[in-house]
A protein has these predicted regions:
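H-loop/switch region of ABC-family ATPase nucleotide-binding domains
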Residues: 183-185
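A short, flexible loop at the N-terminus of ABC-type nucleotide-binding domains that lies
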Residues: 1-6, 10-23, 54-59
Length: 229
């Protein structure tokens, strides 16, 4: 079973004396988990640590223990910067070819992934001409092409309209990924598909559990209140 476990994790960025994460203990297994909290609470940094990119990409200092068991794919907020090829087809071909698949197998996977993500009609269009919502689906398709056991998404609803959000929720509920971790404050979209919510405050986990069981703590009322929008 794929899992991620953090034990007493502290993290800070280069040239900063302030710890962004402060003694985080968190374990995620085969489940759909949303990480929420106020702006500046450390959500994005936590996902970077959980995906393994924090030190590799940003450097800085990490203390504690991070255990990652399983193939991880990470889609950051700046997802469009990580699409390297001119068209979605070329992007998927590039990723799948690196997995030593034959040409026929690559084409089969492109067809499967494009149908799953609803980007079949976008495959040969230039990425720069796509809307933000369309680019986001391409970015998620690229992540799925890596055949991950753990998929981590940072603020996936930030650049899409309500209809696009409904479509994305439907997509996320049917991806078939063992472990799904999402950083998001628009909980109204995800309330019906998540197994657990983790609330961050000032770099610390202040609640981890079900939406229904969340305590009436003022530190977590703010993100949970978004369910009543």
């Amino acid at each position: 079973m794929a899992f991620i476990e953090l034990k007493e994790v502290f993290y800070r960025y280069p040239e900063s004396e302030e710890w962004v994460l402060k003694g985080v203990n968190l374990s995620v297994g085969s489940e759909k988990v949303v990480i929420t909290g106020r702006t500046g609470s450390g959500k994005t940094t936590l996902l970077r640590v959980m995906s393994g990119v924090a030190l590799k990409v940003y450097g800085g200092e990490l203390r504690g223990e991070v255990l990652i068991d399983g193939r991880v794919a990470y889609v950051p907020q700046e997802f469009d910067l990580y699409i390297l090829m001119p068209t979605p087809r070329e992007e998927l071909t590039y990723i799948l070819s690196a997995q030593n698949l034959g040409l026929n197998d690559v084409e089969v996977r492109i067809r499967e992934i494009s149908e799953l993500l609803g980007i079949k009609e976008l495959l040969d269009r230039r990425v720069v001409k796509l809307s933000m919502g369309e680019r986001q689906r391409v970015a998620i398709a690229s992540a799925i092409a890596l055949n991950p056991e753990i998929l981590i998404l940072d603020e996936p609803f930030a650049h899409i309209d309500p209809k696009g959000a409904v479509d994305l929720v439907r997509l996320l509920s049917n991806l078939g990924v063992s472990t799904l971790v999402i950083s998001e404050h628009k909980l109204r979209y995800l309330a019906n598909i998540i197994d657990r919510i983790v609330v961050l405050r000032d770099g610390t986990v202040v609640y981890s559990g079900s939406l229904e069981g969340a305590p009436k703590d003022p530190d977590i009322e703010w993100p949970l209140s978004m369910l009543r929008w």
